[in-house]
Structures are given as structure tokens and as C-alpha cells.
Amino acid sequence: MKVVAAFLLAVLSGKASPTTGDIKDILGSVGAETEDSQIELLLKEVKGKDLAELIAAGREKLASVPSGGGGGVAVASATSGGGGGGGAPAAESKKEEKKEEKEESDDDMGFSLFE
């Protein structure tokens, strides 16, 4: 990841195609070490490609990866643009809050440590 970040910094600083030395200089300025093979692999993969195209391709790949948890529900209701989708998540959060309150009261099990 640090090699990719250094590559992006080099491109954003005005170098159209950064070299291994450019990336090593950036990483060296913050005391980060990396293997030459990692830098060479990155430069080989991005050679001749536009930065905007690389970012767009990365976004497409990330969008295709499923994310765990309830995040998909929120995205689906937010992107659906439907009228009634907003009420359901609010109702669910109220139910969860009530459950949490009940669990907290059960923690003492009927006695106090300080009595």
C-alpha cells in the first residue's frame, strides 16, 4: 500500500511516469522501507496507463465486492429512491436500543458488588 501511495504522490507532483528512484525517494523521506520487487511490479502493472483510468477501474472492482453487515440494506434503500424505504431502518434502530437497555439491566443479576 505504501508503494501505491508513493506512486500516487509522485504522479500528483507532476511526474507522468515515476521511476523506481522517485518512489524510493518519497518512501525514504518518511523512513519507510520497501523491496525493489514491489516497486518494479507496480511500475510494470501501471506502465502506459492513465491515473484516472486506474482509479476508475479500482472503483469498479471495489463496487463489485460485497460488504458485510447491514451496509447493503442502507445502500439499497438510499439508492432506490423509493418513498417508503426510509422508515424501516429507523424502526429497527429503536428496537435495537430497547434490547440494549434490557441487557444492561440484566448485568447486575439481582445483587450489587458494593452492598
Curated annotation (Swiss-Prot):
Protein name: Large ribosomal subunit protein P2z
InterPro entries referenced in this protein's UniProt entry, alphabetically: P1/P2_N_sf, Ribosomal_P1/P2, Ribosomal_P2
Region Disordered, annotated ranges: 62-115
Organism: Arabidopsis thaliana
Regions of compositional bias (Basic and acidic residues) in chain numbering: 92-102
Listed Pfam families: Ribosomal_60s
GO cellular component: cytosolic large ribosomal subunit
GO biological process, alphabetically ordered: cytoplasmic translational elongation
Keywords: Phosphoprotein, Ribonucleoprotein, Ribosomal protein
UniProt keyword Ribonucleoprotein present: yes
Post-translational modification: Phosphorylated.
CDD domains the UniProt entry points to: Ribosomal_P2
Function, in words: Plays an important role in the elongation step of protein synthesis.
GN (gene name): RPP2A
